[in-house]
Regions:
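Bacterial N-terminal signal peptides
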Residues: 2-12
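Exported/periplasmic ABC-transporter solute-binding proteins
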Residues: 13-61, 65-71, 78-81, 85-271
Length: 271
């Protein structure tokens, strides 16, 4: 009898506790270029005793379309502002729940060569990317019969930035036929790492965390639209806000900068 009373007294509280724990789990859709740091940050976050965080990585365009189609998601981190703007226009994210999280840069990379130089080391670029006579020929000489791996410029943010940069340098028209367009930036990085492409145009963060690449050149910041990663809340619960705040913490910022990103919380207009 006492055992039955004990169960009646404590069983409901156990269920409530389980429901509370389940309610703390959340889903984050993030640009593929954020894979390495977000996995580390999520591990650090869950070690604090917080709920589970499920991560889904893909091209920002793919994720935005999935969200618009009704895919369950609590936080969206895009690699460009256009797709975040799209979800705001669709009424899925409110302007007050949008905040700029990170910045990035664009670089040209090649497979690690016999000198053992990697893009993550502090080495001098081997190519001067400035609008000048002969630049196209120098790039073609490195390419040989190969192609440039980069995100698809039709919809992948990294590819869109890459197209802007090549157009700014005056070499897009001829190089556009020498591309391997990929579904996201990480795939372009992998193709170069494997030696399947002699050159790649990727984010500086991807080259920073790779030990199989060497830096060929850094694109001038003025050659493309500023690379900004906005964060938006799809749902607005205490657990979602808690993880959002953790992403802006000093611990998370250290992981982001250690992965080659630029933190931009101090920029004006970042809410």
């Amino acid at each position: 009898m006492l055992g039955a009373v004990f169960l009646l007294l404590f069983w409901p509280w156990t269920v409530i506790g389980q429901e509370k724990k389940e309610a703390q789990s959340l889903t984050v859709f993030a640009a593929a270029s954020l894979t390495v740091p977000l996995q580390k940050i999520t591990t650090a976050y869950t070690e604090t005793g917080a709920g589970r965080v499920d991560l889904s990585f893909a091209a920002s365009s793919t994720l935005a379309r999935q969200i618009a189609a009704g895919a369950p998601c609590d936080i969206f981190i895009s690699a460009d502002r256009a797709w975040m703007d799209h979800l705001i226009e669709e009424g899925l994210i409110t302007p007050e729940n949008r905040r700029n999280l990170l910045g990035n840069a664009l670089v040209m990379v090649a497979p690690l060569d016999s000198r053992g130089e990697s893009a993550s080391e502090d080495i001098q670029p081997t190519l001067n990317l400035s609008p000048r006579f002969g630049l196209e020929g120098e790039i073609m000489a490195i390419l040989g019969s190969g192609r440039i791996a980069m995100g698809d410029p039709a919809y992948v943010p990294a590819g869109i930035y890459g197209r802007e940069a090549l157009m700014s340098l005056g070499v897009w028209m001829n190089l556009r036929h020498r591309l391997i367009p990929t579904a996201n930036d990480r795939l372009a990085t992998v193709l170069v790492e494997r030696g399947e492409a002699p050159l790649g145009i990727v984010y500086a963060s991807d080259s920073h965390t790779s030990h199989a690449l060497r830096l060929v050149a850094a694109f001038p910041q003025s050659s493309h639209t500023p690379i900004v990663y906005p964060l938006g809340l799809i749902s607005d619960s205490a657990a979602v806000r808690d993880f959002r705040d953790f992403l802006f913490s000093e611990k998370a910022s250290a992981i982001f900068t250690g992965s080659g990103f630029q933190t931009i919380e101090f920029l004006s207009g970042n809410r």
